[in-house]
Amino acid sequence: LPLALAYVQYLNCTNRRDGDSCGECPNCRQIAGLAHPDLHFVFPVNKQGKKSGEAVLSDDFMPLWRQVVSERNGYFSPQEWYDRLDLGRTLKGAISAREADGIIRKLSFKSFAAKYKCVIVWLPETMNEEAANKILKILEEPWEKTLFVLVSERPDLLLPTILSRTQ
């Protein structure tokens, strides 16, 4: 995750120096703060405690996500994340089809302030088949200046249809 964030920050830095991002321009500061309008996160969540049929999205957990990434400097395990979601040891998170719809919707808008619109997908191996099918086309042929960064701990568990469309 830290490398993905550094890469996105470098791509969108308006004042690169010595092969690195400046860390000072508005884009760098917003990306470092996980609050840039052209940076989107997708990560596994669970509808624990929600009413049946009520979907949950990564956006519902952004304040907690920012807190965990900040506290741990981006280095934390899936279980640490699930513990923060109060899922215990048996429940896990997933990336849903509704989340995939949200990704497509967010990326359909024009870039707000950065050179690239970026989506960091943390643990894409938790994406269900329906979600994967929904994003296949945009993953294979993303819109201009759109970047997906998949951060996987178990690439062997990625759906073959997703894996075949990545570099």
Report residues per predicted region.
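Conserved adenine-binding aromatic site and its adjacent loop/helix in ATP-hydrolyzing domains
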Residues: R105, K137, S164
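Short glycine-/acidic-enriched loop or helix-start segments at secondary-structure transitions
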Residues: K51, P160-T161
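Conserved H-loop
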Residues: D156-L158
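Conserved Walker B catalytic segment
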Residues: K117-C118, W122-L147, R154
